[in-house]
Amino acid sequence: MSSNKVILYHANWSLCSQMVRVALYEKNIPFVSKHIKLCDQYPEGENINKKFLEINPLGTVPAIKINDDITCNSEEIIKKLNSITSDSNIDLYTIDNHESSSIIKETTITEGHKFASTIGTIIPVFSAPLIQHMVKKLPIKSILKILFNHPRRDRKYFFVAMYFFNFTKNLPKRLRYRK
């Protein structure tokens, strides 16, 4: 059994966080769960607080701390978890590395990939109505916090625009968020 101290910083709704949690459970690696209240869902916006930005300067989840080493990309986190010896003796990559890498790149929301070029990078298109619904419920104080504190210019402007404008009204009815 591994003697690593593992702390997972994650959000329940985050697809990438869910994938990392599955990997941890599959490998039977004990971990401490630190739920992060994301700025587009909660007024607290813990992912853009100074304390979390010291862990992940991009303000995104998941992030994992294994002993003193921090990794912030879900693809890299899963690779790192797979290298840890555990009592489950499970290999998360049951097919060759090239094929595994190809599947992971197609299905994760990975930084550096062109928007809508993979299944993972198209997901935000479908989740935008739900995100906008949550952003519009935030108090203006939270929107200002996003504007001044979010390290990612693209996300900060996107969330602020969602708050003040209605992007989803032009979507087909089946894609709009329903109460």
Give names to the regions the model predicted.
Residues 144-179:
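Alpha-helix-centered segments that form part of catalytic cores
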Residues 1-155:
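GST-like domain detector, emphasizing the conserved glutathione-binding G-site
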